[in-house]
Amino acid sequence: MKKHKKLLLLMTLILAFSSVLAACGADKNEGADNGGTDKPKEQVFRMNLASDPPTLDPGLAQDNTSNTVISSVFEGLVRKGADGTEEQGVAEKWDISEDGLKYVFTLRQDAKWSNGDPVTANDFEYAWKRVLDPNFTPASPYAYQLYYIKNAEAYNLGDIKDANEVGVKATDDYTLEVTLENPTPYFLSLMSFQTYFPVHSSVEGNASWATKPDTLIGNGPFKVSQMTKGQKIELVKNDQYWDKDSIKLEKVQMSIVNSSATELSSYRNDELDYAGHPTGNIPTDQLSAIKKELGDELMIKGISSTYFYIFNTTEEPFDNVNIRKAFSMAIDRKAIVEKITQGGQIPAFGFVPPGIKGESDEYRTEVPDTYFQENLEEAKKLLEQGMKEKGYTTLPEVTLIHNSDDNHKKIALAISDMWKNNLGVNVKVQNQEWGVFLKNRTDLNYQIARSGWGADYNDPMTYIDMWTSNGGNNDTGFKNEEYDKLVKDAYATSDNAKRMELMSKAEKILVQDNQVVMPIYYYSSVSLVKPWVKNLHLDYKGDIDFTRAYIE
């Protein structure tokens, strides 16, 4: 997701970025088809994870690392093709009512779980209602993604007690009927999102089912054969998968190493076939040498994702909006992308990134990200004003947390230096292991925290509805009735122009009026792939799909 070149290259990348995203994520697989090797290769794909996946339960996953594994071990009703369009998954066909409120999915009868059991419509109904169950512990961070379904929100919040009132029903073993609250143009694309994946009913009552290969029953192209915490995850081809003849890889080996330098070294030594985004990183200080040495294997691609910091709005000193605004105005985003990340990133002054569809063009083209400017003098005034409002003579001690990663650390240290030089504020930088970091964010046990967000589907709503008062991924404590109403109204209207207007008003409240988030840059994906790896794809939001890849 990270790195930036200089001005001439940036312009080139922006053009490439636009064409890639206009195609909704089609991937050229640069480097994978150039050249070759005389070295014989087994059908084994080797990559690295910078951390252990916090969970392999589709109902609980909320991060790229978890989803990379989950999306190869499970499959939804539809799957995303290489060009970003919906393809048949477990569903062999679907019908949508004229009013857009009812979806009827017909499941293929040859879909099986990895233990040989048939995958049925009941498995989907069970999985979705499991996520929505108000007693589901821990609560699913993505339960709100199912709120498009009739009565889903009311059931999840406890206003409706009977799960049978939720608009999802298996009418027979191979027919799933879904009724929505409102017409939702992107609902079909959500069927390839992990929270909508089926779960085998055997997980009931077994909280640790997703931590062991023998109880982790999936229905995707691969199954987990080995899991050793802090060391590796190994996947093997699932011989029960309905489309197994299209799967060429026999194994996927995932090392777990939290060092971008070690990851790069392993790649150079032919111990990895892939390195970098989305589950690892390429050291930014090595990019110049990599371009000379491994230029044909380097992929730099603009993606629809945003790198940002969040403020805990419930704790001092960031319960004051002027202090939040001062911190956001006092950093130099251009310096960060040109001197640190160096991989085609674009400074961000909004939350929704380029490449996301708007009314008739990209949303970001129709709604420019002019919500604030970098202004040191104004930042100093706002800090002084905020401190006066809080009764401070000295700002309380401030800590910025980030998950352990060399590149996140470089960015955090650079930004803390900017705050010191520009505002006279000392900020402690603290790195945390991924699982600990996520829990501290969720529990609001932080002051400022690193974050990143990629599209779950190609619509601005994927960046907007997460900040509602009950949003499962709203780790800021931000609650705003006007914001919540704008999101609900946007859900309810089928007028696309009106939807965009409502969402742009919500984004203004989030970024300009309240500065809940501090946008830093719009991501690019930087990765390396060996020339013998074929048919590997990164989609418009930067997710990797190796399920149909092969070694040649």
Residue ranges of predicted features:
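N-terminal lobe/hinge region of extracytoplasmic solute-binding protein
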Residues: 48-98, 217
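A structural "hinge/loop" feature
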Residues: 49-68, 90, 117, 139-140, ...
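Aromatic- and charge-enriched surface segment that lines or borders ligand/interaction sites
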Residues: 92-142, 317
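Alpha-helical secondary-structure segments
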Residues: 120-127, 173-179, 220-221, 249-251, ...
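Gly/Pro-rich hinge or "lid" segments in bacterial periplasmic/extracellular proteins
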Residues: 154, 173-174, 179-247, 251
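Ligand-site clamp/hinge motif
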Residues: 205-207, 240-286
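Detector for C-terminal structural segments
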Residues: 330-361, 407-416, 438-552
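Structural transition elements
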Residues: 347-386, 405-409
